[in-house]
Amino acid sequence: MTLQIGVIGCGAIGQDHIRRLTRTLSGARVVAVNDIDPQQARDAVTKYGLDAEIYADGHEVVAAAEVQAVLVTSWGPTHEAFVLDAIAHGKPVFCEKPLAVTADGCMRIVEAEVAHGKRLVQVGFMRPYDEGYRALKRVIDSGQIGAPLMLHCAHRNQSVGERYTTDMAITDTLIHELDVLRWLLGEDYASAQVVYPKKTHHASAHLADPQIVLLETASGVRIDVEIFVNCQYGYDIQCEVVGEQGIAKLPDPPAVGLKHAARQSVEIMTDWKERFIASYDVELQAFIDGVRQGALTGPSAWDGYAAAVAADACVRAQKSGAVEAIAMAERPAFYRG
């Protein structure tokens, strides 16, 4: 069975997913598209040679008889309504982050999915599909380094645009760490604090950069995450886990080691899409396979809610300078196991 997918949102990430659905992945095809800009939808159909209906409204895509699953890559504030509509129609939905722009919105999706009685939602957190993170989790889960005590992490971008704001360091950047570190450790966060080092002169006047986020988990693991979005030298993701008996470190992407002109060097990536391109392929293939097999296994609506609650606390901590509690609702039995 070839899964027939409707895509809502034909911007950069939407077209990137259309490309991989059309040219890279197996078991699915795009049969319907929508974008707030009709020309973008038409351009996507032409560019990728789609045999797809263009709909004027995203909710029409959800309701379309030919659509068996939905891909939501539209503007963030629209995600909640489209995901809820997909659940109401009983259709599996892959939603790019954010699942909703508030934790309350994520909880409404959780409640709707629980009421439906079957997992239909996968959230577009791709790092758990990165082979480096998977290898790191295997080491942690094996017990080889003992119980994790501390994590030292960094999320560095070469530069960001003028529209990037201080809170986006949490909602657009740290959000990936909030998801993947919770997945690595298998436990929720208890508190968050944000501190500000000396500001780089490469940052816009309105932007606090860098920032250091200090997290504590329910069991007491301490995590520090450096967010530095104007580091200049490249795109660099680091994660070191300090355990009771050893240390495990996220591997850097493979690169040719060069010795030349009395120097030794390794190239550093500058594009975040290049760094995680394989992960995007694997996560969407996992969604396709999960739908076809009748069991989704990727990041769930509950994971989207957990990330949103933690992000809200981090934004509060940015403003207060205090240690902010991260208080989540009780996890429904539906999402356990």
Swiss-Prot record:
Molecular function terms, GO-annotated: inositol 2-dehydrogenase (NAD+) activity; nucleotide binding
Keyword terms of this UniProt record: NAD, Oxidoreductase
EC class (word): oxidoreductase
Reactions performed catalytically: myo-inositol + NAD(+) = scyllo-inosose + NADH + H(+)
Pfam family, any one: GFO_IDH_MocA
EC number per UniProt: 1.1.1.18
GO biological process, one term: inositol catabolic process
Gene3D superfamilies according to UniProt: Dihydrodipicolinate Reductase, domain 2, NAD(P)-binding Rossmann-like Domain
Protein family (similarity comment): Belongs to the Gfo/Idh/MocA family.
Subunit-structure text: Homotetramer.
Biological role stated in the UniProt entry: Involved in the oxidation of myo-inositol (MI) to 2-keto-myo-inositol (2KMI or 2-inosose).
Listed HAMAP family: IolG (MF_01671)
Protein name per the record: Inositol 2-dehydrogenase
Organism: Burkholderia orbicola (strain MC0-3)
